[in-house]
């Protein structure tokens, strides 16, 4: 075969050299190793396998309570016995009510700690037993509450009179027969 013909055939076919083949092989091998290292969680699962569970870290409130207890011990708090209820009055007129809380106090450091479940209630729910606990700020909100209650009673009284009139038997008019309209 002629050398010129062979050179033309090789140029048209572009036969690669051994070194370029090794370079391509190294790239493919390094990519597969990289994929195996980074995607180990995804390779072992196939169709029909359950999803990977994510580990959730729950922050326990027990640790916070322990920190609080140690801080309170440093302040030399003393438990106060025989407290039946604690009410905290908010500016909007609602009350945070603690029934039978545990109370610790440190008078020199002016610190009080309440333990228990607090429920947010309206002032109307606690009115009979809470009157002796009201201060001057709360008395103003109590007056507003009493005025609104009186207005509601007046409105209910006028509606009650209207309901009584509607329940009465209508007056009959001479010359009209209501029984014929029913049939």
UniProtKB/Swiss-Prot annotation:
Subcellular location: Cytoplasm; Nucleus
Function: Component of the nascent polypeptide-associated complex (NAC), a dynamic component of the ribosomal exit tunnel, protecting the emerging polypeptides from interaction with other cytoplasmic proteins to ensure appropriate nascent protein targeting. The NAC complex also promotes mitochondrial protein import by enhancing productive ribosome interactions with the outer mitochondrial membrane and blocks the inappropriate interaction of ribosomes translating non-secretory nascent polypeptides with translocation sites in the membrane of the endoplasmic reticulum.
Source species taxonomy: Eukaryota, Fungi, Dikarya, Ascomycota, Pezizomycotina
One of the GO BP terms on file: protein transport
Keywords: Cytoplasm, Nucleus, Protein transport, Repressor, Transcription, Transcription regulation, Transport
UniProt organism field: Neosartorya fischeri (strain ATCC 1020 / DSM 3700 / CBS 544.65 / FGSC A1164 / JCM 1740 / NRRL 181 / WB 181)
PANTHER family cross-referenced by the UniProt entry: TRANSCRIPTION FACTOR BTF3 FAMILY MEMBER
Name this protein carries in UniProt: Nascent polypeptide-associated complex subunit beta
Spans through the membrane: none
InterPro entries xrefs: BTF3, NAC_A/B_dom_sf, Nas_poly-pep-assoc_cplx_dom
Main location: cytoplasm
Stated family: Belongs to the NAC-beta family.
Limits of the NAC-A/B domain: 62-127
Start-end of Acidic residues biased regions: 164-183
């Amino acid at each position: 075969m002629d050398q010129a013909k062979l050179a033309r055939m090789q140029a048209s076919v572009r036969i690669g050299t051994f070194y370029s083949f090794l370079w391509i092989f190294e790239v493919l091998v390094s990519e597969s190793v990289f994929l195996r290292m980074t995607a180990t969680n995804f390779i072992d699962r196939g169709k029909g396998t359950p999803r990977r569970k994510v580990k959730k870290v729950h922050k326990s409130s027990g640790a916070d309570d322990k920190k609080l207890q140690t801080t309170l011990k440093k302040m030399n708090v003393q438990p106060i016995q025989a407290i039946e209820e604690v009410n905290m009055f908010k500016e909007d007129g609602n009350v945070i009510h603690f029934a039978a809380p545990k109370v610790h106090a440190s008078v020199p450091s002016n610190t009080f700690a309440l333990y228990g479940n607090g429920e947010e209630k309206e002032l109307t729910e606690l009115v009979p037993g809470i009157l002796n606990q009201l201060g001057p700020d709360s008395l103003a909100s109590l007056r507003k509450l009493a005025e609104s209650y009186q207005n509601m009673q007046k409105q209910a009284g006028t509606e009650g009179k209207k309901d009584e009139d509607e329940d009465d038997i209508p007056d009959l008019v001479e010359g009209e027969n209501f029984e014929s309209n029913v049939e």
